[in-house]
């Protein structure tokens, strides 16, 4: 699965969705904030690493970065900080 971003057109769409979620579900603000944090981390990791596995550790804010190529030898854990 190619998760690299050739351009960042999706960023404004994600921002719009985050705002819409906030407007529509102001009573569930904690859930919305958590979703925004998750989306921000995905965006951060997309920008900094071209590929990553689907295994997320949300509480520890880390994921396994899989090297590109036909047979990656090991996974390297990177941390992605939400600003």
From Swiss-Prot:
Compositionally skewed regions (Basic and acidic residues) per UniProt: 14-25
Alphabetic keyword roster: Early protein, Host cytoplasm, Host-virus interaction
Cellular component GO terms, alphabetical: host cell cytoplasm
Subcellular location: Host cytoplasm
Broad class of where this protein is predominantly found: host cell
Chain intervals with Polar residues compositional bias: 1-10
Induction behaviour: Expressed in the early phase of the viral replicative cycle.
Region (Disordered): 1-25
Spans through the membrane: none
Role of this protein: May subvert the host innate immune response by interacting with host IL1B and interfering with its function.
Subunit architecture: Interacts with host IL1B.
Family: Belongs to the asfivirus L83L family.
Protein name in UniProt: Protein L83L
Species, as recorded: African swine fever virus (isolate Tick/Malawi/Lil 20-1/1983)
């Amino acid at each position: 699965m190619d998760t690299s971003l050739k351009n960042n057109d999706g960023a404004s769409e994600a921002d719009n969705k985050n705002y819409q979620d906030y407007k529509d579900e102001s009573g569930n603000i904690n859930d919305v904030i958590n979703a925004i944090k998750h989306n921000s981390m995905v965006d951060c990791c997309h920008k900094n690493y071209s590929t990553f596995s689907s295994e997320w550790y949300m509480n520890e804010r880390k994921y396994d970065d899989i090297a590109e190529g036909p047979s990656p030898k090991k996974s390297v854990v990177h941390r992605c900080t939400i600003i």
